[in-house]
């Protein structure tokens, strides 16, 4: 599982900055963690967030402008047998897309196993087989994705940046006239 690891998030729900992650990594070096003893009175409590998937789905859908419709749009969603296996299909289907889902049967060992953004071939083939207009393949922890068009052609991060830049330019939002990726 070399492509996956632990992610820490701050109280705002976003990933920690690199400096904070570096400090945490230093604590995890052999011999360091064992020497740290926490005062039981200072340790917080963990609790289960009821309906976390539902709440996250609502948040993700709120990021899509209401004017953007997915009704009847045929998509392939490859969840890499990982973190996106429940949420991604739910979000796209609730937005109205007609989805075909692959990589949504994690067993604890098959994450990224010849599937997902690091192995987009199955997504590309499925797009062609079902006649989808596009496909999205996430990596195991769902912090990256790669896309393909209706012909199975890969749309990578540079392509996405170019598409976003052209959109921003058309709306007068690209202030400097350039994008650095």
What are the roles of these predicted feature ranges?
Residues 2-130:
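Gly/Ser/Thr-enriched, mixed-charge loops and adjacent short helices
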């Amino acid at each position: 599982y070399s492509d996956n690891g632990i992610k820490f998030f701050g109280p705002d729900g976003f990933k920690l900055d690199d400096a904070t992650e570096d400090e945490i990594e230093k604590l995890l070096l052999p011999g360091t963690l064992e020497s740290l003893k926490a005062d039981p009175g200072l340790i917080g409590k963990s609790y289960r967030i009821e309906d976390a998937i539902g709440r996250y789905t609502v948040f993700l859908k709120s990021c899509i402008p209401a004017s953007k419709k997915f009704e009847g749009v045929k998509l392939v969603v490859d969840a890499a047998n990982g973190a996106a296996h429940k949420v991604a299909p739910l979000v796209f289907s609730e937005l109205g897309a007609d989805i075909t889902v692959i990589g949504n049967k994690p067993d604890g060992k098959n994450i990224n196993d010849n599937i997902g953004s690091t192995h987009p071939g199955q997504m590309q083939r499925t797009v062609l087989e079902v006649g989808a207009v596009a496909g999205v393949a996430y990596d195991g922890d769902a912090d990256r994705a790669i896309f393909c068009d209706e012909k199975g052609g890969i749309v990578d991060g540079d392509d996405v940046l170019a598409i976003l830049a052209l959109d921003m330019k058309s709306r007068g939002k690209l202030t400097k006239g350039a994008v650095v990726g």
